[in-house]
Amino acid sequence: MSVTLHLRGETKPLEHRAALTPTTVKHLIGKGFKIYVEESPQSIFKIDEYRRAGAIIVPFGSWISAPRDRIIIGLKEMPEEDKFPLVHEHIQFAHCYKDQAGWKDVLRRFINGNGTLYDLEFLEDDNGRRVAAFGFYAGFAGAALGLADWAFKQTHKDSEDLPAVSPYPNEKALIKDIGKAYKNALKTGAKKPKVLIIGALGRCGSGAIDFLKKVGLPEENIIKWDIQETSRGGPFPEIAASDIFINCIYLSKPIAPFINYELLNKPDRKLRTVVDVSADTTNPHNPIPIYNIATVFNKPTVKVNTSSGPKLSVISIDHLPSLLPREASEFFAHDLLPSLEQLPSRHVSPVWVRAEKLFNRHSARAIRESKL
């Protein structure tokens, strides 16, 4: 059975990544897939790259009226104001399985249209490991912005916030830019920061470590924590004693907070910047309960209202890999490709069968809870 994929243009502001790259489009067409690609003004990839790869180019937003047998693939969630029923099979990150704000409304659109959601976050292999994730570049970009904010605080007044950031064409340009800010901060007499990473052994943590090493932070300044170190339960004074804290955990169940105001309001606190890569902002079990808004590239930080100690900011951008959209997209699409190749047999392929069962389970829960 041949499969037709329709790559929809992203609508989330400043989202420049793509679920399919020209490289993967060319590969899938070679396997017998038919692929439509929407014109997308914000994609890092030029439409001609897709055209040369063999895709059929269609107008932005045309997925809405596309034939029902097309599988619609995208990355981020659709605009909140859209309410029309979803009639297709969709592959995307929907952020609606962990009780996030508005999760029932998201699922209701699929239920009302008799559509199906294959959530990219929950495509897992037989060992329960995600088949594809942006974690590495989320950690890489998160560490970059965390160091940028720390450096900015050394060279600017507390009344100023880290200015807007824009995507970089490649990793080398990002390292050069943040490295320059870091060196300027050290010229003020500031000591090299200590960075504590929780979730250091995962994809995200390894990305954060990789950036910090490449920008020149000494190994001894990178404090790597994972399950063993956090097993005693928070809050952890070690976080307040670090200069930068990067949260890279995958939140799957309620846990004790990592940090609280009692630790933050001490006058000797060193912590200046928190990077919540996980960005479970609206999750009731968020282990960093010191902020309540997701930040954006245009305004990357939010100030924490502490009563003592130096200025403290949180970075909680939920699409950090978009700072390096081309490399992040290629990395992700490469890992996703083997699962996409199984789409012709998705009704028996374990990866897709599990994803559909999960969708059905949460849909039933949404219906049940809406009736309560």
From Swiss-Prot:
Pathway: Amino-acid biosynthesis; L-lysine biosynthesis via AAA pathway; L-lysine from L-alpha-aminoadipate (fungal route): step 3/3. L-saccharopine binds at residues 17, 76, 100, 130, 134, 278-280. Its main location: other. Pfam families: AlaDh_PNT_N (PF05222). InterPro entries: AASS (IPR051168), AlaDH/PNT_N (IPR007886), AlaDH/PNT_NAD(H)-bd (IPR007698), Lys1 (IPR027281), NAD(P)-bd_dom_sf (IPR036291). It is an enzyme of class 1 (oxidoreductase). GO terms for molecular function: mRNA binding; saccharopine dehydrogenase (NAD+, L-lysine-forming) activity. This is Saccharopine dehydrogenase [NAD(+), L-lysine-forming]. It comes from Candida glabrata (strain ATCC 2001 / BCRC 20586 / JCM 3761 / NBRC 0622 / NRRL Y-65 / CBS 138) (Yeast).
